[in-house]
Amino acid sequence: MLHRLFGLVKIHIETAGGSGEGEVVLPAVSKSAAVAIEAVIEDGKRRARMKEAPEVIMTGLPFVSMLPILEVEEREEVERQPKVETTFQMKTKELLLLATTSGGIGVILSGVFLFLMQFSEFIPVELIYGQVQTMLKTGIIVVATIVAVVFFIAWILSVAMTYISYYAFTVQKDEENIIITRGLLEKKKVTVPLTRVQGIEVIQNPFRQLIGYETVVLHSAGSVSGDGEKLNLFPLVRSKKREELLTSLFPTMAFPNPEHRLPKHSRPYFRRVHYNWLLPLIAALIYFFPPYGWLSVLLIPLHFAHSAWRHHSASFQVVDKQVILRHRGLLSLYTMYTTRRRVQSSTIRQSIFQERGNVGTLMLKIKSGSWQAEGRVPHMDIADARHIFYQTTPEKK
């Protein structure tokens, strides 16, 4: 915000192999200087491509006659401005929906907790503990009301933070880059070269999915956000428009829903993986909290339903040189779109029980900022897993 008051901007330049800290960081420069720096960088990229172009040897023409041609071509190349098209712009209604359904409340509460930990020696813990005991004696309704008020205030703060952060969110594209701008108090502009894009991940939250919205994340080589956060290509987009928008940005890729489902014999493995903690938890609740602990038995049918849901959601597909992997976490559905040559590592994991059922978990990792992003399909048929594995290993690229 201080930058905008004084007409200044902060420039963060990161290369593909950067660690996220930035090779060049200019804390405060004028807007005109920032535009000039951006123009110099783009001109350098164009000159680098001209040098990489194959050399053309022409015979039969005097050397002097070639000079005007070269001068005209160079002048046209420098003067030519890339055409920028606006692909996506978040509306106010979508921005409010994003703010109200975001998970920022967890960030607020964790920040308050860390703040209290830093100043714990100045906080009268015994006095607060005594007040809590007094409130517990007065009734659970008072305590529940206070907790609800605290969570409501934290939710209001998270809504405000998300709204300010993603205000005027716009995605543009020129011939070589994707340009993302957002922010109200602190306006940010991120430029991602198309050659550095490693994959696209679609995240479908069940609550947003009910009203037809989802989130699209862009994975790029090197840090591009400047502050270490993941880069949201479409923070909130209509599900029916997602494929059209992605195709306009990446015309060489396809973004269908994966068609190949998991076999029926892999369904029991989605249940077995959680038995090692679910059954001891139920036993402990029954032992320590009778008779209400018996209500925990209801977790068993809920677990069966959740496992069947995860099995039904998982799928995969290989489209030409692309790989599409889909799996469901605790609630959200994750779909990874990438190409074979972008895969950095492929892994198949098999337990003893999975070997008996001829199933395994396939995991593909791609570069994402300073780290890696993972696409996976759990408990898929081992033949299908090996087929994708051999196609994405370096020897097969």
Region roles according to the model:
Residues 1-397:
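N-terminal basic, Ser/Thr-rich segments that initiate or prime the first beta/alpha elements at protein or domain
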